[in-house]
Swiss-Prot record:
CDD domains: STKc_Nek11 (cd08222). Transmembrane segments: none annotated. One of its GO terms (molecular function) is protein serine/threonine kinase activity. This is Serine/threonine-protein kinase Nek11. It holds the Pfam family Pkinase. Phosphorylated by NEK2. Phosphorylation at Ser-273 is important for its activation. Keywords: ATP-binding, Cell cycle, Coiled coil, Kinase, Magnesium, Manganese, Metal-binding, Nucleotide-binding, Nucleus, Phosphoprotein, Serine/threonine-protein kinase, Transferase. Its cofactor is Mn(2+); Mg(2+). Residues 399-446 are annotated as: Disordered. Residues 29-287 form the Protein kinase domain. Residues 302-385 form a coiled coil. Interacts with NEK2.
Amino acid sequence: MLKFQEAAKCVSGSTAISTYPKTLIARRYVLQQKLGSGSFGTVYLVSDKKAKRGEELKVLKEISVGELNPNETVQANLEAQLLSKLDHPAIVKFHASFVEQDNFCIITEYCEGRDLDYKIQEYKEAGKIFPDNQIIEWFIQLLLGVDYMHERRILHRDLKSKNIFLKNNLLKIGDFGVSRLLMGSCDLATTLTGTPHYMSPEALKHQGYDTKSDIWSLACILYEMCCMNHAFAGSNFLSIVLKIVEGDTPSLPERYPKELNTIMESMLNKNPSLRPSAIEILKIPYIDEQLQHLMCRHSEMTLEDKNLDCQKEAARLINAMQKRIHLQTLRALSEVQKMTPRERMRLRKLQAADERARKLKKIVEEKYEENSKRMQELRSRNFQQLSVDVLHEKTHLIGMEEKEEQPEGRPSCSPQDEDEERWQDREEEFDEPTLENLSEPQPIPSMDLRKLESIVEDATSDLGYHEIPEDPLVAEEYYADAFDSYCEESDEEEEEIVLAGPEKEIKNEGSQPTYRTNQQDSDIEALARCLENVLGCTSLDTKTIPSMAADVSPGPTIFNSVMARTKMKRMRESAMQKLGTEVFEEVYNYLKRARHQNASEAEIRERLEKVVPRASDCFEVDQLLYFEEQLLITMGK
């Protein structure tokens, strides 16, 4: 089962969504399959009927929230609108949310690579580890996403490997805001939704949750990517809490760069004010150098993708044009087949006349180009051989040239021709030796249209068409003779003429090229832009978030006790299914007494191992007791 949420659990309870495939939800989303279940609810893969091509698949999270009060519903919708405006390549896109009966439904972006926890477990079982450069790249992507949220005063509150998803090998932060949407912004809401392995000391001690708490969780994820294990592990819930609050700071193995280990240790500082912010980490020289390498690589990838997309787009346009021509040809063929033999013959002769006109036009254009080129060469040759000093030319010579009369019998010329004659006269007066070597300009031959028409007739004589006789009786006999052979052969000829091209095109219709979706391209391009923005930002003052900044997003401020009880009910049902009802009751009652009596961890472990094979199997029961106690304290206040 896919690990999109908490460890998969079989949860009973009411549901507003049918598990049958192809079910239509909210008149827009078609249910494809169930992806998994978690502590909050069930996750489905759906297809959006109104989405763009290539972006139809989305994820629907169905969360049972009980009967929400009207003010809680309104505030949850306001928070959903805020989350839907977030747009970053390292954050899962939040599309929409709606309430259906006693379920709150959230529509988010679909990531086909599953979550980071699944990827880590897959590598761990295979005995492999992630390459250093891959870890650095993923870590930088997470830093960019966290910095984007913190700039907008939005806290995640539940950063962990199961809430980070892979899409085209890019990490995307997801499932944030769920606690704010459903349980409010109090400390207990964070404790109930958070996973103990990633929770910061101040969150466990109810000293407040701020941006530096997300930084702590991010450091735990970095350690998990490097070591394939949790940074703070233990056999039960309280042992993990003690390690986080009072234990030593873990270190990375020696195979990783010292700079990376130093950064992680600073992020795991138990004093929140001493932890660096996301933008401060991005400005550390070691990370800044890695940023530059990533930006160069992503820029090259973007350029290659654009070139490839241009080629694919050109191929797509060619295929579309060929298909259009094919359809037009089929329509024309159908029109021809509906004609009578006389109409077909007339159409054929009209086509022959059009072809003859096109050839005439082509020959005229060629002759015109030839004459123009020849005139240009003559003008250029005469102009290059002039040796007149225009600046020192005598004014009386110019006056004499202007008064010269035109030769008899010579037609009047345009002003442009007069200028050419002046230059030629100056050549004769000032540079006679040069002009003697010049060949006299040849007159441009006039075009004989009759001769041109005869040439075209000779060129088109191979068509085998003859003029229609003007005499009606002769023409009737002419048509009768022509149609005998035409009716038998014309259909085949028409098919050869009209369908010569489309046959190849029809064969190519079946093999359409696969296109990369716009979303994949935009993620890489957007990530490259984010890297450029971070490298271009030289001042930390403009982006640094105060270490103790409160989460001021317009979210719910009232704690939803119904949602908290629902979560604990699911946790109890899951533990009962794992241990059995009798064993669960025995473990639950014993741990409740042991915690009140402050029994030692060794004593508790020894007693639990007599009831269950492993003491770690009771982790969920221990966590349930802790949550119940915290809930009573909160409700008492």
